[in-house]
Amino acid sequence: MLLLRCQLKQAPPQKVSFRFCVVMGKQQSKLKHSTYKYGRPDEIIEERIQTKAFQEYSPAHMDTVSVVAALNSDLCVSGGKDKTVVAYNWKTGNVVKRFKGHEHEITKVACIPKSSQFFSASRDRMVMMWDLHGSSQPRQQLCGHAMVVTGLAVSPDSSQLCTGSRDNTLLLWDVVTGQSVERASVSRNVVTHLCWVPREPYILQTSEDKTLRLWDSRGLQVAHMFPAKQHIQTYCEVSVDGHKCISCSNGFGGEGCEATLWDLRQTRNRICEYKGHFQTVASCVFLPRALALMPLIATSSHDCKVKIWNQDTGACLFTLSLDGSGPLTSLAVGDAISLLCASFNRGIHLLRMDHSQGLELQEVAAF
């Protein structure tokens, strides 16, 4: 193991140890070189390069993976350039089912809570509804957008679906009937992502016009516009309690490339920014508290890095570089200690958080 150190202030060397997590399933063990940075409590930033074994499962997709989402504590659903939606057991390393029907790349997936059903969106302008326990054919096909569909969000009670597109339009659908019930359009509002606020009638939406909007699903009207950012907003995520949200910015060379924490309550102010990526931040998640002593968020970027941040202070606590993976496109929480990260070149990465000796994030499998 080669240890590189970049010190902000002098401190005695510390012992470095690594753990290996075994994941069962059809797999092959391979050696992988990975780089990560760790922000120690004494404010020293250590960059470490390690060679370790990780598990390579049978692949979920044969091309770039655009999106991944957790269906339940064992299964994820993903989509990509191969036009296929895949249900995968990431704990055993097995494909559960493949769903085919789209004519072009999958752009988004959204799962119905506590259900075996989920939706997919595509560059073919279609949205399809699938059932893990049904046939491999779509249960519903929703057609209403004039351009690629780039946003999907299911209401907390699972009765409605909101879709957004590059055609500047949002549509609200009745999940049972598959009929469109509301339509709204805002000039230059090229939708990049949608997220429904838990226990509320509100939908959060990011746009290429650099704006984060809050929509009221009752009539599908804009309820609030947050202050515009300097760069395209690529993604948004809402906390489980519905009090906060994160938006992500595109960028290059460290310009832009940040995530921003916003207050969704009365003030609706910007709370904190997370800066440290060097290319577009494509995804973000609020992490389960689990064993952590502080609230954490994670971001993934086109710079091949996943970062974990202190939600309250904006300090970067850990950086994992998934070398050779290309741009990281999507991030999802698998369980209390596991993350799923989709990539251009190496499929989906299974990452584990370890709190036993300070915070560490390790890649334990890829599929």
From Swiss-Prot:
Alphabetical keyword list: Repeat, WD repeat
Cited Gene3D superfamilies: YVTN repeat-like/Quinoprotein amine dehydrogenase
InterPro entries named in the record: G-protein_beta_WD-40_rep (IPR020472), WD40/YVTN_repeat-like_dom_sf (IPR015943), WD40_repeat_CS (IPR019775), WD40_repeat_dom_sf (IPR036322), WD40_rpt (IPR001680), WDR31 (IPR040066)
Keyword Repeat: yes
WD repeat extents: 53-90, 94-132, 137-175, 179-217, 221-264, 269-311, 315-353
Keyword tRNA-binding carried by entry: no
Pfam families hit by this protein: WD40
Protein name: WD repeat-containing protein 31
Species the sequence originates in: Homo sapiens
The encoding gene: WDR31
